UniProtKB/Swiss-Prot annotation:
Organism (species): Rhodococcus erythropolis (strain PR4 / NBRC 100887)
Protein name per UniProt: Large ribosomal subunit protein uL2
Record-linked Pfam families: Ribosomal_L2 (PF00181), Ribosomal_L2_C (PF03947)
PROSITE patterns: RIBOSOMAL_L2 (PS00467)
InterPro entries reported in the protein's UniProt record: NA-bd_OB-fold, Rib_uL2_dom2, Ribosomal_uL2, Ribosomal_uL2_bac/org-type, Ribosomal_uL2_C, Ribosomal_uL2_CS, Ribosomal_uL2_dom3, Ribosomal_uL2_RNA-bd_dom
Oligomeric and partner information: Part of the 50S ribosomal subunit. Forms a bridge to the 30S subunit in the 70S ribosome.
Length: 278
């Protein structure tokens, strides 16, 4: 993909850019693979806000993506179209299988209309092909990796993301994640060859707040500019620093709040954070 820059005809257009969508070959999705998607505006079943800064945005339909691909082993397919998906940063590819079935997959870099695609232990090491990690050569760039065998692709699914297969030992494979983290997964887990396409998406300049609203993202307001009734940092005469250690709108101290997951024991080396990133 390439990025098209707008001329500064208005303040909102100045500096903004958009994808040229040159890779897209069809504008309407496959009707049999589309499901309705109802926006909840960040509310739960009680109508209370559980996720802030969400709401509005353009109406979307969900495209059913095949993240497992384990029931199509040995059945050849061909890429019929590369399509835009409003629900993710990556593009998607519509596959027509030899048995007549149609399915969507994440479109990797280099996959074009008419490309052959296959899955299974005997598949070639070509972009878009899906096979178990035990059958993928060391050093290969992959995406859409499972965390558990048969669980479906969980890692490296966004635009430009990729994972490197560093090695295999016994029943585990060692992977370098996009964040730099090194972790082990079962060699029976499946992955797709290549890196996810549409890598230039991260370089798009959205230009104005309105384009964020089209995506369903609402403003993020700082607590120190609120009133005391709305936030613990609110109130005070003139500009204040909040007068206390940073807390959430509900008074919980800012910082790490999540417990370790069971899968964390598979991490060999943590990703670099903070000053260690350099």
């Amino acid at each position: 993909m390439a990025i098209r820059k707008y001329k500064p005809t208005t303040p909102g257009r100045r500096g903004s850019s958009v994808s040229d969508f040159a890779e897209i070959t069809r504008s309407t999705p496959e009707k049999s693979l589309v499901r309705p998607l109802h926006g909840r505006g960040g509310r739960n079943a009680h109508g209370r806000i559980t996720t802030r800064h969400k709401g509005g945005g353009h109406k979307r339909a969900y495209r059913l993506i095949d993240f497992r691909r384990n029931d199509k082993d040995g059945i050849p397919a061909k890429v019929a179209h590369i399509e835009y998906d409003p629900n993710r940063t990556a593009n998607i590819a519509l596959l027509h299988y030899a048995d007549g079935e149609k399915r969507y997959i994440i479109a990797p870099k280099g996959l074009v209309q008419g490309s052959p695609v296959e899955s299974g232990a005997g598949a070639d090491i070509k972009p878009g092909n899906n096979l178990p990690l035990r059958n993928i050569p060391t050093g290969t760039t992959i995406h859409g990796v499972e965390l558990r065998p048969g669980g479906g692709a969980k890692m490296a699914r966004s635009a430009g993301a990729s994972i490197q297969l560093l090695g295999k030992e016994g029943s585990y494979a060692t992977l370098r994640m996009p964040s730099g983290e090194i972790r082990r997964v079962d060699v029976r887990c499946r992955a797709s060859v290549g890196e996810v396409g549409n890598a230039e998406q991260s370089n798009i300049n959205w230009g104005k707040a309105g384009r964020m609203r089209w995506k369903g993202k609402r403003p993020t307001v700082r607590g120190v500019v609120m009133n005391p009734v709305d936030h613990p940092h609110g109130g005070g005469e003139g500009k204040t620093s909040g007068g206390r250690h940073p807390v959430s709108p509900w008074g919980k101290p800012e910082g790490r709040t999540r417990k370790n997951k069971a899968s964390d024991k598979m991490i060999v080396r943590r990703r670099r954070t903070g000053k260690n990133k350099r």
